[in-house]
Amino acid sequence: MAKEKYDRSKPHVNIGTIGHVDHGKTTLTAAITTVLARRLPSSVNQPKDYASIDAAPEERERGITINTAHVEYETATRHYAHIDAPGHADYVKNMITGAAQMDGAILVVASTDGPMPQTREHILLSRQVGVKHLIVFMNKVDLVDDEELLELVEMEIRDLLSEYDFPGDDLPVIQGSALKALEGDTKFEDIIMELMDTVDSYIPEPERDTDKPLLLPVEDVFSITGRGTVASGRIDRGTVRVNDEIEIVGIKEETKKAVVTGVEMFRKQLDEGLAGDNVGILLRGVQRDEIERGQVIAKPGSINPHTKFKGEVYILSKDEGGRHTPFFNNYRPQFYFRTTDVTGSIELPAGTEMVMPGDNVTINVELIHPIAVEQGTTFSIREGGRTVGSGIVSEIEA
């Protein structure tokens, strides 16, 4: 059979497996790749066994060491990138650093145990970092003889999801056995196909970066005599064209409006700049001293400057090059957003006296300058230029 060409016409979706240790996340990942390879053979659908997924290579993301397995597969209608983090700490780091941006996730719960502490923590983290769509896979149903027990476990999971503002009563719950499917039991293979049909239909197609409102973090500013001020940087999302009205947001109290009079890339004029492009933007009516690194150029009204927010953070361990000692309330490090450091103070949650290296915690932050942030913006926490933590904005306060 001739090799298929990679089909870019299929929508691409990022998903992952989450849930308590030993509930079968990695076995399910292996089962999905294996069953799809049997049922929908293609150059993309290659079976991956448990060992190869479990032996995930170490990666460094913003100074943090994370073990993550990335696998890809496709259904009849979509192409998926699937992330599986072997250890609980890896999972937490993945979520908080934004290394794994998931459009949706499969929550794996062993029917033999029901929801466990990490089940709860992963649901909470999904809520905090903006994973909006969860599908439940109740694993190991072949080990439970009592139908009523399965119903109880399902109710318990649904209640837990509702507690964290997921639609617990309505979201899909699929009961199966990843191991049996992996071993080739057709009944359980059918359930894996049903799970993938559910993922196809329940997790909406993500909005493409180019369809989102413009956001361009300013890296450099210079003036061209007779033409005006140029701001350069990499377009984070959206598009920019000549004659677009934009806003310059952050650092300064006032948000300034301006009009784009030119878009250049590698010294060539462009009709439009797209997400991912490194561009220079010529701005009319902006003085050289009215814009600086650390601000963002954005579609008017799409993002606002803030000084106070709640964040979900992971503090590097000593082995990762982080602090050697804990920090306490009112700790004042630098927060690095996109292209700049801003000092801020940290307020710890009630009842938390200190944070140890290697911990993850929810904090309240107050910055000394306003910065363009929104829910889901990631940041690093730094001391004297070295990274000591990593976080994501979970809620805007002011």
UniProtKB/Swiss-Prot annotation:
GTP binds at residues 19-26, 84-88, 139-142. Residues 177-179 are annotated as: G5. It is found in: Cytoplasm. GO terms for molecular function: GTP binding; GTPase activity; translation elongation factor activity. Residues 19-26 are annotated as: G1. Residues 10-207 form the tr-type G domain. GO terms for cellular component: cytosol. Pfam families: GTP_EFTU (PF00009), GTP_EFTU_D2 (PF03144), GTP_EFTU_D3 (PF03143). Residues 139-142 are annotated as: G4. InterPro entries: EF-Tu_GTP-bd, EF-Tu_GTPase, EFTu-like_2, EFTU_2, G_TR_CS, P-loop_NTPase, Small_GTP-bd, T_Tr_GTP-bd_dom. Keywords: Cytoplasm, Elongation factor, GTP-binding, Hydrolase, Magnesium, Metal-binding, Nucleotide-binding, Protein biosynthesis. The keyword Signal does not apply. Its EC number is 3.6.5.3. It catalyses: GTP + H2O = GDP + phosphate + H(+). Residues 63-67 are annotated as: G2. Residues 84-87 are annotated as: G3. Monomer. Belongs to the TRAFAC class translation factor GTPase superfamily. Classic translation factor GTPase family. EF-Tu/EF-1A subfamily. HAMAP family: EF_Tu_B. GTP hydrolase that promotes the GTP-dependent binding of aminoacyl-tRNA to the A-site of ribosomes during protein biosynthesis. This is Elongation factor Tu. The gene is tuf.
